[in-house]
């Protein structure tokens, strides 16, 4: 269903950033700036071993102005624990910095369905999702470590 929302926003707005860059539906748990991706590999693998799948309820849409349109889950116990585990896995790395917007207790979980939208495209995305969006239950079954802009999957592990 999330892929359909991404496709619908792209089709309606003409903004194909998400589809052209093959950005899959995902919930970003942390944004880490690191000197080298290699230093993130082992902490990621160690952390991923202890994770389990979990359920989320995607209940609303929103905007991170000026460019991002998203659907958002209820922040439940599973997501809170996931955020804490990811933060703890990377917080002490000397050459890595976790964004202040993705730390436990200071995080807006969301699934981006439109990115790099103009003001007019944002309005179009809102209009189409106002008509189409239906709350849904989803299962978190994988965790990945990816580069962004453009999107590039690095490591993916089942949870």
Model-derived regions, located:
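Short, flexible active-site-adjacent loop segments at beta-strand->alpha-helix junctions, enriched
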Residues: 33, 62, 67, 75, ...
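Short hydrophobic/aromatic-rich beta-strand segments that constitute the beta-sheet cores
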Residues: 29, 70-71, 113, 145
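Basic, often amphipathic N-terminal segments
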Residues: 1-55, 78-137, 152-159
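Hydrophobic, well-structured mid-protein blocks that either form specific transmembrane helices
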Residues: 49, 53-65, 69-74
């Amino acid at each position: 269903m999330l892929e359909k929302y991404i496709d619908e926003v792209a089709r309606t707005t003409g903004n194909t950033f998400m589809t052209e860059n093959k950005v899959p539906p995902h919930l970003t748990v942390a944004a880490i700036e690191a000197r080298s991706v290699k230093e993130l590999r082992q902490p990621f693998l160690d952390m991923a071993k202890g994770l389990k799948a979990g359920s989320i309820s995607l209940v609303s849409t929103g905007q991170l102005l000026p460019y991002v349109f998203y659907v958002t889950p209820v922040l439940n116990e599973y997501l809170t624990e996931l955020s804490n585990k990811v933060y703890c896995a990377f917080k002490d790395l000397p050459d890595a910095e976790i964004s202040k917007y993705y730390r436990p207790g200071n995080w807006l979980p969301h699934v981006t369905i439109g990115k790099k939208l103009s003001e007019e495209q944002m309005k179009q995305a809102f209009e189409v999702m106002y008509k189409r969006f239906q709350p849904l239950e989803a299962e978190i079954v994988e965790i990945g470590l990816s580069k962004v802009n453009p999107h590039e999957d690095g490591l993916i592990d089942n949870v």
